[in-house]
């Protein structure tokens, strides 16, 4: 069957699929999951320097992102005061990011070698995690924005709606919705021999030239466009509300916290949109039949794809800078060993001082010989 796109473009752009974060069609009509765009098999030449740069970026993002997101989850689980509705959603976001970051060493190896060496089971797992991350991240940010809208625009109703238990239920629903896509692609994904090299592919059902574009457009709409539209509506209503009143609650401190948390969620959403828009636009344009015609354009596409992964390690940094509670908990965690050592030294000094004082007192009470 004839490819939907010109062969030279696919020979340059594709090899093994494992990179990127938007769905496309490969020459054999296999649908690639979102983060799985960039590689260099099918005989395409990928300069070693570019390979090393991409792999180095992946490893840096993996290490930094895992440390940050694991710390976020630990802080939320460890401290009771951190178990708010907003932080429950943040935990879900960190969990999804942690899962996808764990796939980066495998995807980096795939980039470096130019083929998939890890077998069928791991291929299915990586594909499923990519789709789960894409949908759970978008849905969680949407839920956070709706949660902020309720807190700002309907403060009375928020007392009943915005509870940690209900936020946990929403998180479960988000993963269930993501399973509508995640489970089927895991079933359809497999490591196959394509052009004498092993590729990790998602085989779409026949007729591929119909279901491929339909699937790609649906992924684009439901994982990006619709969530961004809902988020935009929520924040538009919140801005109008915030401009219309001086105090949202009876307390200036509570009002300050509401605005601070709303600003945090807005920044997290903005960074998500900023990181994902470039690759989403690239893939949408390709879906409309316009392909990059230069090596520079292909290189830009590769790094736009990597930018999607960078988003997964930025969120903990945003929490540390924009949320006082997270900042305090992070500082407490990082300074704990030093503080323990200082306390041990202080206790030792006090013990020595006490012994010296006792010795001096004893010497004063002992009668001196005449």
Swiss-Prot record:
Lipid-anchored residues (S-palmitoyl cysteine): 334
Membrane topology, Extracellular segments: 1-48, 110-124, 189-211, 286-300
GO BP term (any one): sensory perception of pain
Keyword list, A-Z: Behavior, Cell membrane, Cytoplasmic vesicle, Disulfide bond, G-protein coupled receptor, Glycoprotein, Lipoprotein, Membrane, Palmitate, Phosphoprotein, Receptor, Transducer, Transmembrane, Transmembrane helix
Origin: domain of life: Eukaryota
Gene Ontology cellular component list: cytoplasmic vesicle; neuron projection; plasma membrane
One Pfam family from the record: 7tm_1
Keyword Ribonucleoprotein (UniProt): no
Family: Belongs to the G-protein coupled receptor 1 family.
UniProt-listed PANTHER family: NEUROPEPTIDES RECEPTOR, NOCICEPTIN RECEPTOR
Name recorded for this polypeptide: Nociceptin receptor
Organism: Sus scrofa
